[in-house]
């Protein structure tokens, strides 16, 4: 039984386009770029600056699950301590668990981060769709921000008496009466939700808030403390000579065609067997929560076992969703958001050809490279790696001649930030033979929800290349769940990064209070 439901890629794309009135005549007639924003800064194109990164943070604080450790509040405290002087915050997705519901925003987002919101001293008065940030806050959509809720309420309503109380009071699953409505809650919370405006007032709104120009393109003006909306689900901005590209990876994470095709294929049979095993594991954990929790409380901190079991159930659900995606993968063109990928290709090429740009940062939810135990092998991980690699190959082909003439060939991206995997990890790709070679990949997905372990297979990721297993990426730092029993460790993490005036522009500053062994500027 699946507790969550995810809309298809075409449904996600269409719904989000409607919400921002994508390419409405009022927008195109003004030659507005709906994928660009700008915010004012006193920094010059080569000045150093810092920014913060967090992700997978949206669990409840102070009640229900995690109420004893209050991870969201700890993250918020770190943000306040380390955020002084930061230019902006990047969020790698999954802002509100479990299903991105508008009902959960006050408890799972507004309360923990109220100090960064206008009127945050009275969080109860802040509506989730009326938030204004004091500091630039730039999120991307996570998978949980798109989820809906078809069966969970039926499950809970079918549980009676002490068992229902046990589930609700000890492991509060962070759900309300409905889900995200196909990402609508995120759109109302963070995007410029033009669909909700009267048609006759759209032009006035555009003339008031789309007043900036970047590379001769008219775009949204982001004003901290006044107007802090995003123009689209994927977008870009430039700060002190650094181009930041924020993607919606939920629309190009469909497992590759052929992975699940063929009713009698061995891979398909293996996945069916794995699915059955996962359902069995899930049933055992649900039983353990309901029937074995109270006796276990005599030997452990109250509720910790329930938290752990609920985290395992959530991980199993994500694995089940990934298997369903693999089994249903097809050859249809509508399973890939080609428009977004083409946009990224064109913007990267233009960025490299712009002498005013000194660095490039990419932000998305799903990590292309990761060694976290539940994510490294998933079809979605491999699909995002493939799609991003395909784009970077095209960019490399466009730029190759110019780079050869200049006698240099740098990585196409200075830094890639992601979440989804519940850990903090820094990887670097090697000579992959593609445009994604020699890039640092930072995963910041342990900012408040359950943490997970590194895979037992080790820190090196391999691919089959010309009949040989070749290492394509290696993990330089992994911080996640570790130990057992009294030695169990579940550190929450956020990341801070500082640019430097000399190339390469991005260097590690702090990582949740720790400094990586190697900075991103080193070869």
Give residue ranges: language-model regions.
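Walker A/P-loop phosphate-binding element recognition
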Residues: 358
